[in-house]
Structures are given as C-alpha cells and as structure tokens.
C-alpha cells in the first residue's frame, strides 16, 4: 500500500509539473508577443486606453472630466494599473508591456480563486494556460493585447468563485459581501456587467433551485420547496448582488453621467423579434470561440473544427451539468447553468432590443469553455478519464498551433502608422489632425510627442467627441500642423467616405506619402483652413 501511495503521489507531481510547464510556456509566448510584436498590431482602441491612462497620471485621479470616453465609463478598469506606471516610465511601450503583465497576473489570480473555490484539479493550471493563449483573433485582440475585457471576465471569475463557496457551505458572509461589492463597483462603469454576470447568475441560481425542488401540487408549494433546496442559499446573495449592481448603474446614469463624458445607454429599447440580429448572434458566437474565415483545405478548417467542437461541448455539457443533480457538485452545476443563462440572455438582448452589438461582446460568454472543460476533467469517471484527457490534450495542441500561427503573423506584420509618425517627429511637427483610426496610434508610437485631433468622417474637419481630450474641441492645434489622410479611409473601406476631405487638400502642401497615408503640412491651423476652404475652428 505505501508503494502504491508513493507511485500515486509521484504521478500527481509529474502531472502538476507538466501542467505548470504548459501554463508557463503559454504565458512566456504571450510576454514575447507583448515585448516584440505588439506595436505591429497596435490599433486605435488600444492606443486610446493608453492616452487616458497618461492623462490620469498627469491629473492624479482614477477618472477624468477632461476625456471623452466611449460606450462606458472606466471605473474598475485597466487605467488603475496603467496610470501609475506612467509615473515610473517614459516609454509608452514599456508601460504597455509591464501593465499587460500585471493585468494578466490579476486575471490569472481571479481564475485561480475560482479554481480553488470550485476544487478544480491542480487549481485550474490547464485553464490558466488556455486563458493566456490566443485561441482566436477576437480573444487575442480584445483580451490579451487590448486588455479591455480582462476586468469584465476577471470580475465574473471572482463572483462565480464566491457563489461556489456559498454553495459549498461554511462561511457565507464574506463571499456574499464580495459578490455585492464587486457587482456594485463593476456597474459604476455601465450596465454591461449586469448582462455579462448578474442577470445570468440570478437566472442560473433560480433554475437550479427549481429543478432540484421536490414535486408539489401547487406553484406556491413548489416555490417554497425550491427556496429550501441547497441552491437556495445562493438566492439571497445573488439578489443582493443584483441590487448592488442596479445601485451602481443608477450612480453611473444619474450622478457620474452629469460629470463625465461617455455614451448614455438610455437609447436601448425593445423591438420586435429581429431574425437578422439573431443570425448575427450566431455568427458572433462562432467568432468569439475562434471561428475564422479561410480556405476549406487549410489550417483554418482544423481551427474551425475546434471552435465548433468547443461550442457544442459547452452547450451539451452545460445541459448535462444542470440535469446531473446526483452526479455533479452543485457549484459545478452552477457554472453550466450560468453558461446557458448567459447565452439566452445575450440572444434575447440582441434579438429583441436595438442594443449596440459587436462580435467581441460575447467573449465573456465564450471564455466559459475554460471552466467547463476543467469541470469536465474534475468530474469525469475513471472509465471515461483516459478519453477525456486525450481529447483535452488534442484540443490544447490545436489551440497552441492556432496561437503559433497568430504569433507568426504578428512577427511579420508592420504598423502602417509607424513610418508616418516617425517622419512627423523628425520634421518638428507636434500638433495635427487625423482620423480616429490613425491619430491615437501615432500618439502612442511617438511616446506622446504627437498630439492629434481626431476627426469623424465628413467632408470637413469635424472633431469627434470620442476617446480624446475635451480640450481638442475647444482649442485648435498650435504652431505648424499636419493633416493625415488615410488612403484606405479615403476609399471608404472602413468608414463613410472622406474623399471630399481628401480632395480639399492642396497638392503643394503634400509633405509625406506612403502606401497607406498622405500627410499635408501647413504653417498653422488658420492657414490650413484658408487653403482648403474650411470654416474657422469652432
């Protein structure tokens, strides 16, 4: 018997070291990407977050009245990490790399909190590697490089971990307080977290209570039975978290909206059933799981097969979890119910309202494949364990291959704004105009040297109150200025055409041209407006 125990302990140590190596390799590859290749794929949204963090570092606050935010206010968000780093480093790239490391470590800490709460094998080391692996273009752009969704997903892991601990019994006050506090803080930024976390979690808890309740002759008795089930212990904390989230959103809409500049979500209204938007939801779900366009006879087919398998696994296994009262721990069943409730919530939101939508909005739902996969490995029977381990290893290998192709593409990519930004700095330009898609990128690439007034697509230089300092709409650029016309933008490939704006530029003012942009130089803002026939600065 001692020998068998020794062999078992040795096998566990070996497995632990393999999983630790897996997570370390995945993390190391991501750090190499940040250090060496991230500037190659820097985009306007990523750069805008850095501009905000730099502004907050100068002002010494966590929010700013001198910034035009986008769809939500940044409260419990990435600027809490990035802004202090600007007081330590002058290189914006260094700030981005160090800040990314810190944020990913916080992301993993939230995951391990959930893993320990749910008693996953090795606290979820396999999942830790998957979380830092770019399994799809959207996840790479908006989580691992852009970092935007790290707060949303990390908060979900923390609150889910608290919920699982409540269902395990023992101390319940501290986890319940954590659910309430994180729900309130997250909702201060806007209503997004309610749809990502609070509403699905409440529905999931209620669903499990209903399914686990003994049969009854009346609805009232059934509800009473549901309340007395083991899952009933979670109902009060989830409802309290809902109340806290609503209170946070109320502060956002009624108090913070009066002081800060961000898009109001009050426009969202119910509509009739929109089949086109439901079709979009299905396609967005595919994309958020890593589906990509490409030739059938290529690696894209393998990656898309993995994405489809993950979607099928998440839905089927979640149903098994919800229905498996006798087989699965209640906390694990909660995760399955949470995934199903989240999918239904998003489908209803986009199918029955006019809410704004983007493929990336489903990333917090798609990433639940990681805890579901870990739960499957933790709960599978000895009979099915070899098959489960083998299929998981195959999936991990495919996703690692997918990540390798992504990193290879990043290594050979070039940022189209790099040459233009260097030219402007070398020739003494500091202030000027560009589209949103170019301007903030140029600022980050030059460590804040270029100060760019970003424009909305129009036939005249109309400033856009979106992800730039408010002073840009009050005062014009100073000294000699530049005006960037992106060729792809002039051709209307991403935004409504600005060909009229391009046509207004006098050719004798052209100072730089490459395959992506034309740049025009003027002695002053007033000189530019006179030469182009534009009205005076507002």
Cite the ranges covered by each PLM segment.
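Signature aromatic-anchored transmembrane alpha helix within multi-pass, membrane-resident enzymes
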Residues: 15-24, 174-181, 239, 306-313, ...
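Membrane-proximal lumenal/periplasmic loop motifs of glycosylation machinery
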Residues: 35-44, 57-83, 93-94
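Juxtamembrane segments of multi-pass membrane glycosylation machinery
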Residues: 61-63, 80-102, 107, 119
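Membrane-interface micro-motifs in multi-pass membrane enzymes
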Residues: 71, 75, 120-167, 189, ...
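Transmembrane-helix motifs of polytopic, lipid-linked glycan transferases
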Residues: 98-122, 158-161, 313-317
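Hydrophobic/aromatic-rich transmembrane helices and adjacent perimembrane loops
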Residues: 147-155, 301-311, 333-383
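Membrane-interface alpha helices of multi-pass inner-membrane proteins
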Residues: 174-200, 243
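Short periplasmic/luminal acceptor-recognition loop of GT-C membrane glycosyltransferases, typified by
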Residues: 427-462
């Amino acid at each position: 018997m001692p020998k068998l125990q020794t062999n078992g302990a040795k096998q566990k140590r070996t497995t632990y070291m393999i999983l630790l190596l897996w997570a370390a390799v995945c993390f190391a590859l991501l750090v190499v990407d940040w250090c060496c290749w991230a500037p190659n794929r820097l985009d306007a949204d990523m750069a805008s977050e850095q501009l905000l963090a730099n502004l907050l570092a100068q002002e010494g606050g966590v929010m700013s009245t001198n910034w035009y935010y986008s769809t939500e206010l940044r409260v419990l968000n990435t600027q809490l990490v990035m802004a202090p780093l600007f007081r330590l480093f002058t290189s914006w790239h260094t700030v981005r790399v160090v800040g990314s490391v810190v944020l990913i470590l916080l992301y993993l800490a939230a995951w391990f909190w959930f893993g320990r709460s749910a008693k996953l094998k090795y606290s979820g080391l396999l999942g830790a590697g998957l979380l830092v692996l770019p399994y799809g273009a959207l996840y790479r752009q908006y989580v691992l490089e852009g970092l935007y969704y790290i707060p949303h997903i990390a908060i979900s892991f923390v609150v889910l971990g608290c919920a699982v601990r409540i269902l395990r019994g023992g101390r319940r006050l501290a986890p319940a307080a954590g659910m309430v506090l994180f729900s309130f803080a997250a909702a201060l930024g806007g209503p997004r977290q309610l749809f990502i976390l609070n509403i699905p979690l409440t529905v999931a808890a209620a669903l499990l209570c209903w399914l686990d309740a003994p049969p009854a002759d009346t609805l009232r008795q059934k509800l009473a039975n549901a309340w007395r089930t083991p899952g009933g212990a979670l109902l009060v904390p989830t409802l309290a978290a809902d109340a806290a989230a609503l209170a946070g959103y109320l502060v956002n809409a009624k108090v913070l909206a009066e002081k800060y500049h961000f898009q109001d979500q009050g426009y969202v209204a119910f509509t009739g059933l929109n089949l086109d938007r439901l079709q979009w939801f299905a396609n967005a779900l595919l994309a958020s799981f890593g589906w990509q366009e490409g030739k059938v006879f290529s690696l894209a087919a393998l990656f898309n097969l993995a994405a489809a398998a993950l979607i099928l696994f998440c839905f089927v296994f979640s149903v098994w979890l919800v229905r498996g009262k006798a087989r699965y721990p209640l906390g694990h069943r909660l995760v399955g119910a949470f995934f199903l409730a989240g999918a239904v919530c998003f489908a209803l939101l986009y199918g029955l309202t006019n809410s704004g939508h983007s493929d990336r909005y489903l990333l917090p739902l798609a990433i639940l494949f990681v805890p579901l996969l870990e739960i499957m490995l933790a709960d599978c029977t000895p009979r099915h364990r070899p098959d489960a381990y083998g299929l998981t290893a195959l999936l991990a290998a495919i996703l690692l291959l997918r990540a390798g192709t992504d990193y290879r593409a990043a290594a050979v990519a070039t940022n189209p704004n790099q040459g233009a930004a260097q030219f402007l700095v070398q020739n003494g330009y500091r202030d000027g105009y560009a589209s949103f898609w170019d301007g903030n990128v140029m600022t980050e690439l030059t460590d804040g040297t270029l100060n760019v007034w970003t424009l909305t697509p129009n036939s005249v230089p109309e400033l856009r109150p979106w992800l730039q300092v408010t002073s840009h709409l009050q005062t014009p650029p100073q000294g000699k200025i530049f005006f960037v016309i992106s060729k792809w933008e002039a051709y209307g490939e991403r935004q409504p055409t600005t060909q009229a704006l391009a046509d207004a530029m006098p050719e004798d003012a052209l100072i730089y041209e490459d395959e992506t942009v034309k740049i025009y130089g003027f002695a002053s803002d007033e000189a530019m407006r006179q030469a182009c026939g534009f009205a005076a600065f507002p």
